[in-house]
Amino acid sequence: MSPSTELLIQAQGLNTYYGASHILRDLSFTVARGETIGLMGRNGIGKSTLLKSIMGLVKPRSGQVNITGRAMTGRSPYEVSRLGIAYVPEGRGIFGNLSVRENLQMAARAGTRGQRDWTYERVLETFPRLTERLHHGGQQLSGGEQQMLTIGRALMTNPDVLILDEATEGLAPLIAREIWRICGLIRESGISSVIVDKNWKHVTQISNRNVILVKGQVAFEGGSEQLRANPALLDQYLGV
């Protein structure tokens, strides 16, 4: 699906600190409806901090976060998620004492897409591995299955934007390929997404636009072909 000009997320001039450490430096970032963004950069340069600033998990010292045109700076993660933003954090955060079925069903939220809604049945069709584990507790799943469950649970909210922080970190290659396949399906469904991952080759196969951060600022913004055609830039900013 081609992105539109409607901005679902608009962050302007963010300055976010951890104590005395200045992490985001006057950073601006947008997500349009239908857009898939690859958010990249070396470790510790502000990618997760940007996502947490958008989600209300960290409060910027200055700057503005608008979600679907509403001022949401400093609002709670719950309030942000109610506006259609789903967040899959690094570390997943599933409910280990609940079954796979319970993890999914507790997140269910009616959508507005009709037959294209992410229902319980559609999520299980997308993640057939979870069908085999419905009655297993979250803590009994492998790392890859937990990641599938976390993404499936996020889709059950029928979001407008899905944010994936370290989408395939620590996963076996076979499972990682399955996650990338699912990311492609999410793009085709029309949901906007922001994908953080170290595998720039896979990210750029899916993304419409790519943003590279360096020291809390945007160092590059452009299309996948532009990024892949510039090995010097990849080496400078990503070390590849």
State where each predicted segment sits:
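ABC-type ATPase nucleotide-binding domains, specifically the catalytic core motifs of the NBD
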Residues: 19, 75, 98-118, 126-131, ...
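The feature captures the beta-strand-to-loop junction immediately N-terminal to the Walker
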Residues: 40-42
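Helix-to-loop junction immediately C-terminal to a conserved catalytic motif
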Residues: 55
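Conserved ABC transporter NBD signature motif
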Residues: 63-72, 83, 116-120, 222
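Conserved ABC ATPase signature
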Residues: 137-141, 145
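Catalytic Walker B motif of ABC-type/P-loop ATPase nucleotide-binding domains
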Residues: 162-166
